[in-house]
Amino acid sequence: MDKEINYGSDYKFIPATSIGSGINIQVLPDLFCHTVQIVNISLVGNPETNEFVLVDAGMPNSANEIIEAAENYFGVNSRPKAIILTHGHFDHVGAIVELIKHWEIPVYAHELELPFLTGQMSYPEPDPTVEGGMIAKISQLFPNEPINIGKNLEKLPSDGSVPSMPGFRWIHTPGHTPGHISLFRDRDKALIAGDAFVTVKQDSLYKVLTQKQEINGPPRYFTTDWKASKESVMKLAALQPEVAVTGHGLPMSGELLSESLEKLVRDFDKIAIPDFGKYVDKKIH
């Protein structure tokens, strides 16, 4: 494994939390959701075989918590077959360097995310002027310089398959980031959405703290392409998922999920797109 891997110089612990922090939820027999402060990671696998895959890598300084969560489900010294990234924002790759060094495993992402994960390019800066709550206002403090995980990173197969996750396929869901992906399993309609949509109003400090469940579009302060975001939500809603784990907020399932997604598609411009902000295209809103 490549030893020359690092975070951007602005990477730091962010003192944000929620009542869900540290909680594990078994969503399906082989799908687990663990909340790290204000973001979710997913662990996919059969605890009886100790084989699993980690989806996303949490907040900065959370490696020990993620390793402990994995070992709680899959046994002491267990390690995933791979890490799959829905995208590369700081709260989804916050522990990736330590996890790579600890587990020595490959990491997969969409090819359009690779420049942000190999030190070549920074994401557009978060927008603290966007319409929204306190978290949006402080988003300028969030780490944004590119990380470099070098040769440990591989692009996802072009055929839509997901390494070490048989039955799942990856779906390109851009808008929040250029190479954002979601993961879907047809046999039980299980969806790992990433930040394509979330189940908490992520720009509101109060709602993040309390984890009040309500469907929303992607986090406003980081989303740069609202037209693509809307199309991505429509694409996921058309799959008619029966259970969804999102990057932020509690898992959602059944009638609540289907009705909420229908509402989000129908009223996306009102629910998701902010009235103002530097990435808002007035022509589509």
What are these regions (language model features)?
Residues G249-H285:
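Binuclear metal-ion centers of metallo-dependent hydrolases, dominated by the metallo-beta-lactamase
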Residues I5-I14, M59-N61, E113-P174, P178-L256:
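Metallo-beta-lactamase
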Residues M59, E111-L114, A196-V198, F268-K270:
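Short, acidic/turn-prone active-site loops that include or flank metal/cofactor-
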Residues T17-F74, S182-G194, T199:
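Conserved beta-strand hairpin/beta-sheet module of binuclear metal-dependent hydrolase folds
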Residues A63-A109, E113:
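Active-site metal-binding motif and surrounding structural segment of the metallo-beta-lactamase
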Residues E104-E111, P128-E131, I192-G194:
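Short hydrophobic/aromatic-enriched beta-strand-loop microsegments
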Residues V53-V55, I84, V107, A190-I192, ...:
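Residue-level marker for buried hydrophobic side chains located in beta-strands
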